[in-house]
């Protein structure tokens, strides 16, 4: 596994109503991990390196800097996107997230499209 699966675990916990964590902090972290490519760090990769190219092409080209194992990484990103989309759909329909409903639904649809699109 070369992708980031913390977002899959958090999304699964949201969908299954697992107690014990702050949903607002979780949503903010899922938003950042799903839509912001991390800056380059010295000594290795962290987070979703290659996210911008994945978003652009629907896959991570093998020549993407800091994003080795491009096929595995592409599959991992798609799985994470779909998982997070399911969590956002669920939360969008709760009173606690009523003020963010439109944002969550828009991001959920964007993630689902990204996870299921055919490469260009």
PLM segments and residue spans:
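Aromatic-rich carbohydrate-recognition surfaces in CAZymes
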Residues: 1-92, 112
């Amino acid at each position: 596994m070369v992708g980031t699966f913390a977002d899959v675990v958090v999304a699964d916990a949201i969908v299954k109503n697992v107690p014990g964590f702050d949903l607002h902090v979780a949503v903010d972290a899922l938003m950042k991990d799903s839509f912001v490519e991390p800056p380059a760090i010295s000594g290795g990769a962290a987070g979703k390196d290659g996210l911008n190219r994945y978003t652009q092409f629907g896959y991570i080209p093998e020549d993407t800097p800091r994003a080795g194992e491009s096929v595995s990484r592409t599959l991992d990103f798609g799985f994470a996107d779909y998982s997070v989309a399911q969590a956002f759909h669920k939360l969008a329909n709760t009173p606690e997230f009523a003020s963010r409903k439109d944002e969550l639904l828009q991001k959920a649809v964007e993630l689902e499209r990204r996870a299921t699109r055919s490469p260009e």
